[in-house]
């Protein structure tokens, strides 16, 4: 496994430089859309369901097999527990922060963690990193919509709102870059970090995207978008 990681390290480093900026572009687009006209609750819920399905598929199809097949029980357990504990701790902090500053801090942490998880995904392979980047792009697109809408209520300048939103989105590639050196650690350490990332992704799907989506009016078509996203990513994976 260690030789395989070293063999593809140059490819991963190159991908880590470019791919993490794709979600930043999505945040920029989401911010522009929100400044012009915020999507309705139905469309927002559909996007969240679809994004949840894509993220879940990326975690199940790319990261889970890597963790499972290595059979490293102790690193998997430690990484998984730390992943869940970290996400719960972040949620607790977000509940204490109020107002625009609290929202900015919470979204900033979410984006940074997403970036770290994206960087970890490349440890499972270039395809895993690409597919997860696609999944996270959909998620942060919605974050861009939400953040811009909230900031526009307290900041009159659209340019400042756009600049602040995009600046915050740069925390995602920063997190991805910081995760890159993990690829040089021993295999058991890498599995532990992959287990950490897997738990973070599952938390994102079950406790953030779907919970927020179900706070809005729901229809069978909107619910079906989760499965459309899941199946769609599986088909893309088979085609690659």
PLM features: residue spans?
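Intrinsically disordered, metal-sensing/regulatory segments
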Residues: 1-240
């Amino acid at each position: 496994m260690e030789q395989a990681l070293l063999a593809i390290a140059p490819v991963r480093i190159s991908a880590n430089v470019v791919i993490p900026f794709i979600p930043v572009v999505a945040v920029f687009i989401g911010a522009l859309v929100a400044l012009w006209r915020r999507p309705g609750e139905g469309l927002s819920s559909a996007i969240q369901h679809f994004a949840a399905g894509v993220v879940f598929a990326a975690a199940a199809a790319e990261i889970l097999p890597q963790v499972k097949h290595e059979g490293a029980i102790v690193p998997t357990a430690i990484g998984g527990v730390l992943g869940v504990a970290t996400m719960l701790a972040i949620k607790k902090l977000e509940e204490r922060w109020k107002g625009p500053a609290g929202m900015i801090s919470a979204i900033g942490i979410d984006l940074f963690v997403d970036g770290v998880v994206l960087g970890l995904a490349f440890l499972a392979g270039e395809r895993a990193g690409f597919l997860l980047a696609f999944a996270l792009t959909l998620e942060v697109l919605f974050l861009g919509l939400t953040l811009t809408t909230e900031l526009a209520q307290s900041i009159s300048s659209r340019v400042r709102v756009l600049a602040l939103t995009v600046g915050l989105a740069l925390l995602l590639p920063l997190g991805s870059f910081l995760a890159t050196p993990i690829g040089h650690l021993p295999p058991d350490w890498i599995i532990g970090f992959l287990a950490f990332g897997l738990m973070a992704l599952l938390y994102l799907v079950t406790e953030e995207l779907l919970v927020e989506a179900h706070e809005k009016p729901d229809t069978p078509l909107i619910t079906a978008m989760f499965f459309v996203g899941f199946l769609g990513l599986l088909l893309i994976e088979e085609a690659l």
